[in-house]
């Protein structure tokens, strides 16, 4: 019983804290990936450069910094324009979905993750991301309803107070 109560409070805490199962990336990792891209550009093969760019894209869309996430989205969208093997496109679509999720564009993120699932129905990462997106949309909806209800309640109280004050004056 105590375990169930603990789970309940953990889920409530997670609901209000906004935590999810998608990893974060810090500036040091991004700087390291940028250095790898420079080195691969200077002295590596084209395949090594592509691999380093994918790692950098991953790091950028997993960043806590909005400008990094936007940069990662732009890099991935530009790289999708060139023809690539389906597996590589699937990875890029997934990373784009993460980037759009991180930037708050949940509908675009869900569209992209759905495309990933169409490509591979049992892809666990994509399925977890889809659930995370849906949970976030639900949570935002519940919070929005709460804010709206609170606003209507406040307006009702003010209107009731005015009516009560006017009826006392008569």
From Swiss-Prot:
Chief site of localization: mitochondrion
Annotated keywords: Membrane, Mitochondrion, Mitochondrion outer membrane, Peroxisome, Peroxisome biogenesis, TPR repeat, Transmembrane, Transmembrane helix
GO cellular component: chloroplast; cytosol; mitochondrial outer membrane; mitochondrion; peroxisomal membrane; peroxisome
InterPro entries: Fis1, Fis1_cytosol, Fis1_TPR_C, Fis1_TPR_N, TPR-like_helical_dom_sf
CDD domains given in the database record: Fis1 (cd12212)
Mode of membrane association: Single-pass membrane protein
One Pfam family in the UniProt entry: Fis1_TPR_C
Localization terms from the record: Mitochondrion outer membrane; Peroxisome membrane
GO terms under biological process: mitochondrial fission; mitochondrion organization; peroxisome fission
SUPFAM superfamilies: TPR-like
Loss of function: phenotype: Reduced plant growth. Increase in the size of mitochondria and decrease in the number of mitochondria per cell.
Transmembrane region(s): 142-162
Recorded superkingdom: Eukaryota
Extent of the TPR repeats: 90-123
The protein's assembly and partners: Interacts with ARC5.
Entry's free-text remark on domains: The C-terminus is necessary for mitochondrial or peroxisomal targeting, while the N-terminus is necessary for mitochondrial or peroxisomal fission.
Family membership noted in the UniProt record: Belongs to the FIS1 family.
Function: Component of the peroxisomal and mitochondrial division machineries. Plays a role in promoting the fission of mitochondria and peroxisomes.
Miscellaneous remark of the record: Overexpression of FIS1A increases the fission of peroxisomes and mitochondria.
PANTHER family recorded: MITOCHONDRIAL FISSION 1 PROTEIN, TETRATRICOPEPTIDE REPEAT PROTEIN 11 TPR REPEAT PROTEIN 11
Entry protein name: Mitochondrial fission 1 protein A
Organism listed in the record: Arabidopsis thaliana
Lineage: Eukaryota, Viridiplantae, Streptophyta, Embryophyta, Tracheophyta
